[in-house]
Swiss-Prot record:
It comes from Nocardia farcinica (strain IFM 10152). 1D-myo-inositol 3-phosphate binds at H21, D32, A33, G34, G35, M36, N37, K90, Y123, T147, R167. Mg(2+) binds at Y314, R315, A317, T341. It holds the Pfam family Glyco_trans_4_4. The lineage of its organism: Bacteria, Bacillati, Actinomycetota, Actinomycetes, Mycobacteriales. It catalyses: 1D-myo-inositol 3-phosphate + UDP-N-acetyl-alpha-D-glucosamine = 1D-myo-inositol 2-acetamido-2-deoxy-alpha-D-glucopyranoside 3-phosphate + UDP + H(+). This is D-inositol 3-phosphate glycosyltransferase.
């Protein structure tokens, strides 16, 4: 069998997925739950449907949560007790990586040898755990960063706290150690290479997706009626965690500027999400900002919505705004477009991939209030243009499905398995990090394998 055939045939039977700081079962849009939660759960479900057992390890955050939950057929969530259930900020979680890792290793030790074929870690905290489990279990590590400290710190919102140096150091360690890196976009792959010295040959670009069976166009009037919104009022919606990084204040300020220019204009700003992060993190702060700007009666706040209600938010809106200072991709943009709603987004990170500028929405450079007000007014003032954009948005979003993401992950897993075990067996050159070299040397000694 040649090398290509061997690589194609390499496929995991069971994988360990690490999501230390947030559970895939948590409600997106509040706390530390967001797009990554959706990503972890949806890809796990798709992989399970392809015959791969998925076990997700996450930190337990409440005493009533059972140790193991079945998220879907073939998908288990293992809730690991590491530190107090409540009151532990994400910035404090590095102190709990040791007990978390210990419990993950203990759970694997109760199984037969070779229980997991591969580890996939999400976010840098999980990567630190993944690096150790990879060496202990002698299986490849695939890592997805989701966000990068160096990128976030280069585009901080006013008043936002920078990511600590310790995180950037941790990210560099993981990137050096991972067998494969999964980047959401080509832009993220470039950032990994240029900012972190990643090996481009070990990066796989696999775009996230959306649940296209759920997020699809529907009756706007019915959606507005369900949400208690006026039938004829232009609506621009923001969906996400209320934190400086996501910049909901940029939308509120732009709306206020638009109304200052034209006080008689009809406009509704719909904010859907809950508190997170630091600085501008409470809905109350955004409510106070709207009051200061004199547009309180034009802004409606809703808590985070489950998927069956969230699709109605997208359908109800004429436009969805994603004004983030940094985004590795932007799932909200794809979900909105799949629902037939154009997107007004910041021209940052993966949003230039998620949104086709001028076709399915508009990208705004920078976060100046006047620029956002101009773009907002231009789109809301041209109903025909919005309608055409909405049609193109659906077609564009059709290229982003979780099924497609899962297939991309399987290709990355296949490459990781082939390189990892091929290096052991002498098939191909393989690519080994220092820790891999040490662990594989130990494996050779134990198994009596000679070079």
């Amino acid at each position: 069998m040649d090398g290509v055939s061997q690589r194609v045939d390499q496929r995991p039977n069971r994988i360990a997925v690490l999501s230390v700081h947030t559970s895939p079962l948590a409600q997106p849009g509040t706390g530390d739950a967001g797009g990554m939660n959706v990503y972890v759960l949806r890809t796990a479900v798709e992989l399970a449907q392809r015959g791969i057992e998925v076990e997700i390890f996450t930190r337990a955050t409440a005493s009533h949560i059972p140790p193991v939950q079945e998220a879907a057929p073939g998908v288990l969530v293992r809730n690991v007790v590491a530190g107090p259930f409540e009151g532990l900020d994400k910035q404090d979680l590095p102190t709990q990586l040791c007990p978390f890792t210990a419990e993950v290793l203990r759970q694997e030790a109760r199984q037969l040898p070779g229980y997991y074929d591969l580890v996939h870690s999400h976010y840098w905290l999980s990567g630190q755990v993944g690096w150790l489990t990879r060496d202990r279990w002698r299986v490849p590590l695939v890592h997805t960063a989701h966000t990068l400290a160096a990128v976030k710190n280069a585009a901080l919102a006013e008043g936002d706290a920078p990511e600590p140096v310790s995180r950037e150091i941790g990210e560099k360690q993981i990137i050096a150690e991972a067998d494969r890196m999964v980047a959401n976009t080509a832009e993220e792959a470039r950032q990994l290479v240029e900012l972190y010295g990643a090996d481009r040959d070990r990066i796989d670009v696999v775009p996230p997706g959306a649940d296209l069976t759920r997020y699809r166009p529907g009756d706007r009037a019915a959606a507005r009626a369900e949400l208690g919104l006026a039938p004829g009022e232009p609506i621009v919606a923001f969906v996400g965690r209320i934190q400086p990084l996501k910049a909901p204040d940029v939308l509120v300020r732009a709306a206020a500027e638009l109304l200052r220019r034209d006080p008689g204009r009809a406009l509704r700003v719909l904010i859907v999400g809950g508190p997170s992060g630091s600085g501008l993190q409470r809905p109350d702060a955004l409510i106070e900002l709207a009051a200061e700007l004199g547009i309180s009666e034009r802004v409606t706040f809703l808590p985070p919505q489950p998927p069956e209600r969230l699709v109605q938010v997208y359908r109800a809106a004429d436009l969805v705004a994603v004004p983030s200072y940094s985004e590795s991709f932007g799932l909200v943009a794809i979900e909105a477009q799949a629902s037939g709603t154009p997107v007004l987004a910041a021209d940052v990170g993966g949003l230039s991939t998620a949104v086709r500028d001028g076709a399915t929405g508009l990208l705004v450079r920078g976060h100046e209030t006047a620029d956002w007000a101009d773009a907002l007014g231009a789109l809301l003032g041209d109903r025909d243009r919005l309608r055409r954009m909405g049609l193109r948005a659906v077609a564009h979003a059709a290229g982003f499905s979780w099924a497609h993401t899962a297939e991309g992950l399987l290709e990355s897993y296949s490459a990781a398995l082939w390189e990892f075990h091929g290096a052991r067996a002498g098939v191909g050159a393989g690519r080994m990090t220092p820790n891999q070299a040490r662990s594989r040397a130990l494996w050779r000694r134990r198994m009596g394998v000679r070079r």
